[in-house]
């Protein structure tokens, strides 16, 4: 029995990721999310960065817009432009999409709570384009899972004006932690980002890899979750304002999200 168990473990470790994905009964890939509905924008005002309930997309303190169906620049023929501006330095705009659970944009409500608890692997795959990338303080790409009373937020932040480095989010201490990995997206060009994360069998967050324009970095960072009463899987995209809150736009395309 021990020899059989060891063989199974070794086989599992040696299987390619693609095989593990496609053989999972929970495997699902959602493509071109940038074209789809369900995105909600929220202003996060400095210095607390809590959600501003009174802020408007057309306000002066911070303003934002999201415009789908852009043919140029585009990779697929239909990108979505995200713009941020305003007057309050270091303020941010967060766009959130509920994938599974209440308010699901995909119609996957999981009211029986049988899907979300069985998901352990997630891939955020997106192309992004900027004409003045240097105006961005940072770009943030998050994968979020809420299950079993625990909150798993795999936050990834590419600091640009903020220092050209990747940070990851510490759920327990609610702070960003530098990885030492450079983040230098190319201006006036399409950048391809792939983020891979996992929830371990012991309910820890595992930050696996970041791949930007074909350059892969293995993170292998494990952290503890926080607590919550939510039940969902969501993703975020966020643009951070710089010290003058200079306006800038980022186009997203081929935003694919895979889970299993």
Predicted features along the sequence, with ranges:
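Extracellular glycan-recognition surfaces and repeat-rich motifs
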Residues: 40-90
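Extracellular beta-strand elements of beta-rich domains used
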Residues: 193, 250-257
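Positively charged n-region of N-terminal signal peptides that target proteins for export
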Residues: 1-4
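Short tryptophan-centered beta-strand motifs in secreted/extracellular beta-sheet-rich domains
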Residues: 126, 189-199, 208-210
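Flexible glycan-contacting loops in extracellular carbohydrate-active proteins
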Residues: 219-253
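Sec/Tat signal peptide C-region and signal peptidase I cleavage site
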Residues: 15-20
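Short, aromatic/His-centered strand-loop micro-motif at the edge of beta-sheets
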Residues: 168-194
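Secretory/extracellular carbohydrate-interaction modules
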Residues: 76-78, 82-166
